Amino acid sequence: MSKEDERFGKCAVAAEHLGIYPHEIIPPKSLVTLADDTAPLIRSFFNPAQEQTLFTPIPISVHVLWIMDCSCKIHLALEEMIDISRDNAVIGVLPKASSAQPPRGSFKKLGHPTLLPKGEAEARIAGEIYFDPEKDPSGKRLWCLTNESGRYGLRAGQSREHLEAICGIFEEFGLYFSMRYVKPTA
């Protein structure tokens, strides 16, 4: 087992029972890879005291999807919806309400597989980040990082330590999150 496998989990395809849907080869418009040059932009998104109040409600009302690919790069995007009947036009983002789903028909959500580099289907671990100021009473970690991805975060073998290691990577870039680990059922 490699050092990366021990730290972040093994690289594997999406959980078989969920698979990857045909529309999930389309990358989200909001897709960004965590790196030195993108970290300031990502930090500004997660700052609830933004100078531009026009955009303040957006981060606190949506889920941010994240995934670690096989080369240990972390990719993030809003959970976007597309209309496959309109040339895959982005029509919005899903609100963070757990019951929120795109309307039936030609509207589809872009899930975790869409965050991977083109042609890749394997990842180490994935989840969501959402605004939860009550999770950390100190008020320093207003956002919560989870492993809630049915295809990449809740597979057998995914551990709390893997999610803690992901938190550590974000912290290296000045991004501090509380954490909620969901134990895989398989």
Can you describe what each PLM-predicted range is?
Residues 1-186:
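Eukaryotic phosphoinositide-binding membrane-targeting regions
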